[in-house]
């Protein structure tokens, strides 16, 4: 994990279900942060809307979630393309059952606007970061956690847009919970957690 007590700057982007939390951490505290309501739930909604508009098919939230998990991508033309995902549902015009193969390239296109909002928020936090800590972040990179970190190619897309390396945390779905658990076991080291 990250040494949050070190006098160096670490930046974490946690893309959860309802929000994306972006924070610069140093000396056991948050130096600057931002929270935006663009995260996994918005990605799922984007996919639902895309299927309706581009393929004239109605899909529910569970199917959209499965599409996101199976073939969700932040970049088109990934090195390792997942197999297209077969979506079955009613045609919006005829109500007849239809079957459509959806590709990760399509999902990358459909998530583009939401991912651009996350990029803008990361850049805003970087602008607010003190120069010394900014340099640490450039050298160490930015750490991605949360379920959204599992979107294929997200680290590469963010690197291409922001020009700082991004690293997906080990077990990103549980990284924040594990870190919180460790901190709560050591409340004497982190008294600010009890305020």
Protein language model features and the residues they cover:
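Conserved phosphate-binding/catalytic loops in two-lobed NTP-binding clefts
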Residues: 156-181, 190-195
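Glycine-rich phosphate-binding loops at beta-strand->alpha-helix junctions
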Residues: 134-158
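Phosphate-binding glycine-rich/basic clefts of nucleotide- and phosphate-handling proteins
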Residues: 27-112
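Residue-level signature of catalytic and energy-coupling elements of molecular machines
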Residues: 14, 47, 122, 144, ...
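Conserved phosphate-binding catalytic cores of ATP/NTP-utilizing and phosphoryl-transfer enzymes
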Residues: 1-13, 181-185, 189
């Amino acid at each position: 994990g990250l040494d949050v007590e070190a006098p160096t700057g670490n930046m974490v982007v946690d893309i959860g279900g309802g929000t994306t939390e972006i924070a610069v951490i140093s000396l056991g505290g948050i130096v600057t942060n931002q929270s935006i309501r663009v995260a996994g739930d918005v990605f799922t909604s984007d996919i639902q809307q895309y299927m309706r508009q581009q393929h004239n098919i109605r899909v529910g939230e569970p199917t959209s979630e499965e599409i996101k998990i199976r073939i969700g991508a932040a970049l088109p033309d990934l090195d390792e393309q997942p197999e297209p995902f077969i979506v079955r549902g009613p045609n919006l015009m005829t109500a007849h059952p239809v079957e459509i193969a959806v590709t990760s390239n399509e999902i990358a296109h459909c998530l583009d606007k939401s991912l651009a909002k996350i990029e803008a928020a990361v850049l805003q936090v970087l602008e607010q970061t003190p120069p010394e800590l900014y340099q640490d972040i450039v050298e160490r990179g930015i750490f991605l956690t949360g379920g959204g970190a599992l979107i294929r190619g997200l680290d590469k897309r963010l690197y291409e847009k922001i020009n700082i390396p991004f690293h997906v945390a080990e077990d990103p779905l549980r990284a924040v919970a594990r870190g919180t658990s460790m901190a709560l076991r050591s409340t004497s080291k982190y008294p600010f957690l009890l305020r």
